[in-house]
Curated annotation (Swiss-Prot):
The gene is aroC. Keywords: Amino-acid biosynthesis, Aromatic amino acid biosynthesis, FAD, Flavoprotein, FMN, Lyase, NADP. This is Chorismate synthase. Pathway: Metabolic intermediate biosynthesis; chorismate biosynthesis; chorismate from D-erythrose 4-phosphate and phosphoenolpyruvate: step 7/7. It comes from Histophilus somni (strain 2336). PANTHER family: CHORISMATE SYNTHASE. The lineage of its organism: Bacteria, Pseudomonadati, Pseudomonadota, Gammaproteobacteria, Pasteurellales.
Amino acid sequence: MAGNSIGQLFRVTTFGESHGIALGCIVDGMPPGLALSEDDIQPDLDRRKPGTSKYTTPRREEDKVQILSGVFDGKTTGTSIGMIIKNTDQRSQDYGEIKDRFRPGHADFTYQQKYGLRDYRGGGRSSARETVMRVAAGAIAKKYLREYFGIEVRGYLSQIGEIKIDPQVVADVSKIDWAKVNSNPFFCPDESAVEKFDELIRELKKAGNSIGAKLTIVAEHVPVGLGEPVFDRLDADLAHALMGINAVKAVEIGDGFAVVEQKGTEHRDEMTPEGFCSNHAGGILGGISSGQPIIATIALKPTSSITVVGRSVNLNNEPVDVITKGRHDPCVGIRAVPIAEAMMAIVLLDHLLRFKAQCK
């Protein structure tokens, strides 16, 4: 199975399955000299880990990261950074009934057809459990971007189902209260929406159902010049990385699909000697960063792992009923915020190193 790596100069490779012994990653291309320990990585892992609130899966994993290589005397050496996180709360018996059945909406069918077999225990490699190592690698990238270039990569949840936050709360990204975002389990900047989210998730959990979500990732203080036209555009690589997150079905850069209804006089980001007058482009022009905040929005589908009976087929293509008995999130978008932050940080650091390699 290919496709386990991302990046050129800053390259991340992950391995492991949902119910395996452990998950791990190799980070290549990290410059030497960055002060780094597990304590720098753990906070982001704690934001993502399961079992931390009543709104997410009850599966409990400590998600304690262990650095195996690439760090000496508390600093990166420039060699490959190896990390692992052990699985401790697998309940593989929950998946015995779907061993020969395909869960609708999951990768069960496509994995079986492509490879001739699949790890049915929690989805194996296709499980969002794999993203824990992306967050670990992304935490390293975020630290380097912040300490060496002042770049901040942060995200927030903007919609669950039909409930949306007040757009005025995030109209000026420089004024977003990030402390407020991280103070509630929904990563939501709008206090008035939190209570509505709470009520919705409670209802869904009682019904055994799930719901989709939308979240936004913002990178501030990104310098002008990141991105390689024509096929290595920064926005193209960001879209590729964000679409690679489990359950993501759409990616928008800047105003995204809203540009369809805009006129040229409205959409163009006019300039004055003092700077840009707007940021409809989301901080990227011609595939190259413009120096404005980079803004990307992703939409995540409702998980198909629900306790409502659904129709499917088995390995013999016979009709069967399927119900998922494992422990799952009623809204995967909640825990996706640190994952999306990680993917944006990985792409930005990769492009930053490529920029430094060829430009003054």
